Amino acid sequence: MLTITSLQVAYGAKVVLKDISLDVSAGEILALIGPNGAGKTTLVRAVSGTTPVLSGQICVDGRELSELSTAQRAKVLAVVPQARQLGGAYSVEQAVMMGRTAYMSWLGHENERDRAAVQLALKQARLEDFAHRQIAQLSGGEQQRVLLARALAQSTPVLLLDEPTNHLDLQHQTNLLSLVRKLAREKQLAVMMAMHDLNLVSFFADKVALLVDGELKQFGTPQEVIQSGHISEAYQTPVEVVTHPETGAPIIFPKGVWGNGEEK
């Protein structure tokens, strides 16, 4: 379980995250939403340890992350970054092996356990047939799955994703999010991801945190958070929210505009 309590982050004299408290349990997906500059990526970076925290606590299964070394932290949470930070000359297998760095000796020697973890991660990310391909030969969606596999190879209880569907077409977006949801359930991962597409959030998230100007405005289920009033106010854009007849997920569209493209 990932628990964030009274978290504050500042850039210089400016406080950019203000008293954030939320949690995500094993097997759940928490989506961070909000307009540009709301603090979604900052929150992911604060939890991952790449952005310093001004005050507050971040705990994984009761362990305070600020008390852990870098190597210890890498064994409790893994990050799928926003940008595709992969060297094109590496093979897929080599890139995924980087996720085992915290488990290797100081000489960087891999062992059978590392190799087994990498093979399992490749299988879970549906990349077994790509193991010996160079990163540069892969599509954007495939590279995003390599980053996911690298994170899975860390064998952590918490998974963080920063805008994982950016620059992906609809097919790759839904494939990736379906895979993340499947893995969250099967491996009992606590997943937190920053997202822009609110309709995708509605279908794939168990919990939603709405951030505006570094403040947590709403926290709950998609049905509780993704309401026309909350979203219109946060994004400064009037929207309508209807309920999907089969799944019950909220669906958002611009207010006053219907399927024929004409104003109401």
Residue ranges and their predicted role:
Residues 33-35:
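The feature captures the beta-strand-to-loop junction immediately N-terminal to the Walker
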Residues 159-163:
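Catalytic Walker B motif of ABC-type/P-loop ATPase nucleotide-binding domains
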Residues 134-138, 142:
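Conserved ABC ATPase signature
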